[in-house]
C-alpha cells in the first residue's frame, strides 16, 4: 500500500509539472477554455480592486476610521485608506494629520508637507491646520530650532498638545509657541537647552486654554530670577516643576493658580528640604482644588525631609512620594502633634490661624485615598516603609479613607519577607472598600456615578462582580 501511495504521488507531481511547462509555452488548455474557465487566484484578487468602489455613507467610514485610530499602527493604515477613493481621502486625512507619529525617517517629509515654503504668504499647506497633537519626543538630532519654530507657526491655529524635542527647541521657538491659542498641553521636560525662564513664562502666560505645563529639566540653572514676577496661565490644572529650581525660586513663589489640581516636583538637583517645605506651606497649602502631589528624584532632600507632608496638605487625595525622603513618622500621631508647634500655617479659607488649627483634626488625614511609594534609586531604602507601618496607621485612625496603595517593585514588597504583610494590607483596604459600598459612601456615593464604579449596574450585579475590589488593594508597578 505504501508503494502504491508513493507511486501515485510521483505520477501526480509529474503530471502537474508537465502541465505547468505546457502553460508556460502557451500550450495546455484551448484558448476558449481558458476564457470560460476558472481564473487564477491572482487575477481574481486584481479584478476585485479594479471594479467600481462600493459606496458607503460618510458616517460609516468615519466610524471605521475612528476605530483604526485606536490601533497601535494606525498611521500606516490611515495612509492606505487615503489611497482608496476621494471619499475615503477626505475622511481619513484629518485623522492622519491630527496626531502624526514622527520619527527620524519621516520627519523631513513631514516638514516639507507642513512648510512647503519658508515664506508663509507664498505657499501655505492646508494640512497644517489639521494638526492637533505635535509630539516630537522621538526626535533627538533631527531638525533644528528654526524648523520647530516654523512648525509651531503653521499649526498655531489648531495645535492643542505639544511635546518639545530634546535638541531642537530654543528661544526662537517661543514666538510661535505664544501664538498657539488653543494649546492645552505643553511638555518641555525633554528639552536639553531650555530658554530663559522669564521669556518662557512670558510666552505662555496669556494662553487661556493651557491646562498642563511641564517645565524643562535643564531650565533655570546658573541664574537667579524673581519668580514673584512670573505670571502663571490662569486656568492651569497640572504643573510639573523641574530643572534648576532652587531655594531662591521656591522661596519667591507667592501663589499658584487656584485652578491647580495636580503638582509634580521632580529632578530638581538644587532644591533643599527647607525650600520645599516653605513652598508647600506657603504656596501649595492654600490650593483648595489640589488633589494630587508627586515628589521624586530630589537628590538634596534628607531621609526625613517630607515627614510633615500629611500635616501640611490636608486636602491631598493622591500622594506619590519617594521613600528616600520619608520615615514611618509620617503616619505617627505624636509627629502630627509636634507639627502644630513646628509650623505657623496660613489659613485655608481666610480664618485666623488659631481657629484653623483648632478646626483640623491632628490625628487624621481624611482626604487621602491613594498612596504611591516609589524609589529614586538610592540603595538601602527598600525597608524604610513597610506594609505594617501603613496597617498601624489605618488601625490608629490616621488614614481613615485610604483605599489604594501603589508600590514600586524596587521596594521588594513582593519578596518572601514582606509578601504576606502586603496581602494582609490589601485585605484591610478591600474590607474598608466593601464597607464603603454597603454604606454608599466614597466612590460608591450615588450608585458609584462619581468614579464610574458600578455605573449602570443594579445592586445584585455589583455584589456579584465585587466592585469594591476594583478600587481598593495593593498594586505593584515597575519603577
Predicted regions and their residues:
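Leucine-rich repeat
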Residues: 115, 139-289, 300-311
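Hydrophobic regular-secondary-structure patch
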Residues: 49-145
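Hydrophobic beta-strand segments of well-ordered beta-sheets in folded domains
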Residues: 98-100, 129-135, 159-162, 183-186, ...
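Leucine-rich solenoid repeat modules
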Residues: 3-8, 12-13, 18-26, 30, ...
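Feature marks extracellular polysaccharide-active and adherence modules
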Residues: 67, 103, 137, 165, ...
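Residue-level signature of the C-terminal ends
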Residues: 67, 71, 91, 95, ...
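Short, contiguous pre-domain boundary segments
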Residues: 40-49
